[in-house]
From Swiss-Prot:
Keyword Cell inner membrane tagged: yes
PANTHER family: FLAGELLAR BIOSYNTHETIC PROTEIN FLIQ (PTHR34040:SF2)
NCBIfam families recorded: fliQ
Subcellular location: Cell inner membrane; Bacterial flagellum basal body
Keyword Cell membrane carried by entry: yes
Source species of the chain: Salmonella typhimurium (strain LT2 / SGSC1412 / ATCC 700720)
Database matches in Pfam families: Bac_export_3 (PF01313)
Membrane topology: Multi-pass membrane protein
The protein's name: Flagellar biosynthetic protein FliQ
Length: 89
């Protein structure tokens, strides 16, 4: 196992992790921003008012993007397992 192969595997793992986390984080960010704007406009400062919609939005995003996320993760794991003999040496 060469240092280049370790770096390549690490880079691919980070790309997959970022691709899996990005949609959920963006949904939470956009939902939080919208709720914060509404709270500022109505002067309602309730912490649970921003927390519950974020959870619901992320849950919906998981349902919508779940098959794509699962496919991406399975493709990465299949590639990793198929290259295992070459990695071990």
């Amino acid at each position: 196992m060469t240092p280049e192969s370790v770096m390549m595997m690490g880079t691919e793992a980070m790309k997959v992790a970022l691709a899996l986390a990005a949609p959920l984080l963006l949904v939470a960010l956009i939902t939080g921003l919208i709720i914060s704007i509404l709270q500022a406009a109505t002067q309602i400062n309730e912490m649970t008012l921003s927390f519950i919609p974020k959870i619901v939005a992320v849950f919906i995003a998981i349902i919508v993007a779940g098959p794509w996320m699962l496919n991406l993760l399975l493709d990465y794991v299949r590639t990793l397992f198929s290259n295992l003999p070459y990695i071990i040496g």
